[in-house]
């Protein structure tokens, strides 16, 4: 097997896609008159488009490459996480969306001040912003890491290219530009996954039936050994618990997803957002896992095509640039770029919305004008993008190891307390501002103890972080002043 040059045609396809994304940003820049337009889309976004955007946002380029690699090297057990995202929809429909819609928020964390006080709001917002600056850096870093052996471009140049493009069209187009580029990117990465699987099927002797027969014989779907309980390994019971809390965090306490609930003009359209996302989640991830199984069978039949000592984390890009036709390979690499950019642009816009609402507007002595809000919003996107890019470059130059485990630990440390605060506020009526602060402190201590003082699997960190807030906040509530009267009954709205 010989790696061939990426080639002019593939580069032309890739840069054609990148230029198209810029044009989308230019188009929607004309609609960004106010901060409401910039962060809420003026309520003009249809539910189905917001749903595709949620799907594209949560399916990063790392998912695009790591899921096939996971199925190639081990099994399909991680698909459980996709279906738990669907299972929590009733919870989101009936308990969370009414609060977010009634308060007419820009930032999800405005709810926490309405329910508790400004301390909870600032903690959650700052945690989100810091986490997503790190997330953007890691997504960029891991994408470049996977692509650089095949594209012949310096990794620092790749980082600058990805980051600069995302900053520009996010800066210009606001949330509308982000969502509509997400729609294009979501369709591209979904279509890319289906196309890759079909093409591998044609290359495998015996086709699709041989792929699934061999995968089953190798016990690479849901191995019986994975059904056991473990405190340290990512077995199926652990994945079910861990992904349940990870999805609750993503869909109830993360600004990049919650922001999609408020860009539509009604609760009906917001629910359509989540239903559209659920339909995509039910179908598309199957193709990513099937790609991994198909590659496993293909390289079993053609072992000479796999370089000795090859890092199987890049198994999908390897197949794309060595086995797929010229032009098609460029399109699929564009899909990987699309998966990265959809997550990055969403993070940048949501960081900006949090800073603008929770820090700048909330802490200003006088109410900022719409023009001032817009200037700050665009400046924050640039600054957050630069910091994320510099962090990604540092990761490349320092050749950091264990970055994925550290990333998942960070999710538990920062995402767990945020999720717990929303759960405490919505489900524990007697919880108050003081008990919420106690819950945050206990949660941080508990997650740090689990991370550095035990061998617990990192999937437990989010569970510990969330439940520590709820338990400590409930127990200590009688020690503080009565809670603000903001309940589910108060959230009733006349929206259709």
Swiss-Prot record:
Upon changing residue 135 to E, the result is: Abolishes Neu5Ac transport
Biological process (GO) annotations? sodium ion transport
Biotechnological relevance of this protein: Sialic acid plays a critical role for growth and colonization of several pathogenic bacteria, and inhibition of its uptake represents a promising strategy for the development of novel antibacterial drugs. Potential sialic acid uptake inhibitors include sialic acid 4-N-piperazine and piperidine derivatives.
Bilayer-spanning residue ranges: 8-29, 47-59, 77-92, 117-144, 155-172, 175-199, 236-252, 273-292, 326-356, 375-396, 404-427, 433-453, 458-479
Q: What is the effect of changing residue 345 to A?
A: Reduces Neu5Ac transport
Molecular function terms, GO-annotated: symporter activity
The segments annotated as topological domain Cytoplasmic are 30-46, 93-116, 173-174, 253-272, 357-374, 428-432, 480-496
Regulation of this protein's activity per its record? Both Na(+) sites regulate Neu5Ac transport. The binding energy of the second Na(+) ion may be used to allosterically stabilize the substrate without directly coordinating it. In the absence of external Na(+), the rate is reduced by 78%.
Q: Give the Periplasmic membrane side ranges.
A: 1-7, 60-76, 145-154, 200-235, 293-325, 397-403, 454-457
List GO terms (cellular component aspect). Answer: plasma membrane
* UniProt topology in membrane: Multi-pass membrane protein
Residues that bind Na(+) 1: 56, 59, 339, 342-343
Query: Reported effect of changing residue 182 to A?
Result: Abolishes Neu5Ac transport
Q: Where does N-acetyl-alpha-neuraminate bind?
A: 58, 60, 63, 82, 135
Keyword Metal-binding set for record: no
The entry's localization annotation reads: Cell inner membrane
- Residues that, per the record, bind Na(+) 2: 182, 342, 345-346
Name the reaction it catalyses. Answer: N-acetyl-alpha-neuraminate(out) + 2 Na(+)(out) = N-acetyl-alpha-neuraminate(in) + 2 Na(+)(in)
Looking up CDD domains in the UniProt record yields: SLC5sbd_NIS-like_u3
What keywords would UniProt list here?
A: Cell inner membrane, Cell membrane, Ion transport, Membrane, Sodium, Sodium transport, Sugar transport, Symport, Transmembrane, Transmembrane helix, Transport
Q: What is known of its domains?
A: Adopts the LeuT fold and is in an outward-open conformation in the crystals. One Na(+) ion binds to the Na2 site, which is conserved in the SSF family, while the second Na(+) ion binds to a new position, termed Na3.
User: Which family does the UniProt entry place this protein in?
Assistant: Belongs to the sodium:solute symporter (SSF) (TC 2.A.21) family.
UniProt miscellaneous comment: Rescues growth on Neu5Ac as the sole carbon source of an E.coli strain that lacks the endogenous NanT sialic acid transporter.
- What is this protein's function? Symporter that uses the Na(+) gradient as the driving force for the uptake of the sialic acid N-acetylneuraminic acid (Neu5Ac). It allows the use of host-derived Neu5Ac as an energy source by P.mirabilis. Also binds N-glycolylneuraminic acid (Neu5Gc) and ketodeoxynonulosonic acid (KDN). Shows the highest affinity for Neu5Ac and Neu5Gc, which commonly occupy the terminal non-reducing position of mammalian cell surface glycoconjugates.
Q: What is this protein called?
A: Sodium/sialic acid symporter SiaT
Q: Which species does this protein come from?
A: Proteus mirabilis (strain HI4320)
């Amino acid at each position: 097997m010989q790696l061939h040059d990426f080639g002019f045609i593939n580069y032309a396809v890739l840069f054609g896609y990148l230029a198209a994304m810029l044009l989308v940003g230019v188009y929607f820049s004309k609609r960004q008159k106010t901060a409401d337009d910039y962060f809420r889309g003026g309520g003009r976004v249809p539910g189905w488009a917001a749903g595709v955007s949620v799907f594209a946002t949560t399916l990063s380029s790392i998912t695009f490459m790591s899921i096939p690699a996971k199925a190639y090297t081990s099994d399909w057990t991680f698909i459980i996480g996709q279906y738990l995202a669907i299972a929590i929809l009733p919870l989101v429909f009936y308990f969370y969306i009414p609060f977010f819609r009634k308060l007419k928020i820009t930032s999800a964390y405005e709810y926490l001040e309405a329910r508790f006080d400004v301390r909870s709001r600032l903690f959650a917002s700052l945690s989100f912003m810091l986490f997503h600056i790190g997330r953007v850096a890691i997504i960029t870093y891991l994408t470049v890491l996977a692509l650089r052996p095949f594209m012949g471009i310096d990794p620092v140049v790749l980082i600058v290219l990805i980051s600069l493009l995302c900053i520009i069209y996010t800066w210009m187009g606001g949330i509308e530009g982000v969502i509509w580029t997400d729609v294009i990117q979501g369709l591209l990465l979904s279509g890319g996954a289906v196309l890759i699987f079909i093409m591998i099927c044609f290359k495998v002797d015996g086709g699709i039936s041989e792929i699934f027969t061999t995968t089953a014989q190798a016990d690479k779907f849901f191995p019986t050994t994975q059904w056991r309980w473990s405190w340290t390994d990512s077995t199926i019971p652990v994945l079910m618990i861990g992904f349940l809390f990870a999805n609750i965090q993503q869909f109830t306490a993360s600004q990049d997803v919650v922001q999609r609930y408020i860009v539509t003009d009604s609760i009906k359209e917001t629910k359509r957002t989540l239903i559209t996302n659920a339909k995509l989640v039910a179908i598309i991830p199957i193709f990513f896992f099937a790609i991994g199984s198909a590659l496993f069978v293909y390289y079993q039949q053609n072992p000479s095509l796999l370089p000795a000592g090859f890092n199987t984390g890049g198994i999908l890009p390897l197949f794309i640039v060595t086995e797929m036709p010229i032009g098609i390979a460029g399109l699929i690499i564009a899909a990987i770029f699309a998966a990265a950019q959809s997550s990055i642009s969403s993070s940048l816009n949501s960081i900006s919305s949090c800073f603008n609402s929770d820090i700048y507007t909330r802490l200003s002595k006088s109410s900022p004008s719409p023009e001032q809000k817009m200037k700050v919003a665009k400046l924050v996107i640039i600054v957050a993008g630069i910091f994320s890019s510099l962090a990604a470059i540092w990761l490349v130059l320092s050749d950091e190891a264990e970055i994925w485990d550290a990333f998942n630990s960070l999710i538990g440390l920062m995402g767990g307390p945020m999720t717990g605060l929303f759960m405490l506020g919505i489900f524990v009526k007697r919880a108050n501002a003081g008990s919420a602060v106690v819950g945050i402190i206990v949660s941080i201590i508990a997650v740090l103890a689990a991370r550095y003082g035990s061998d617990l699997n990192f999937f437990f960190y989010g569970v510990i972080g969330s439940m520590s807030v709820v338990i400590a906040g409930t127990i200590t509530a009688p020690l503080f002043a009565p809670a603000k009267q903001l309940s589910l009954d108060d959230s009733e709205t006349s929206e259709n």
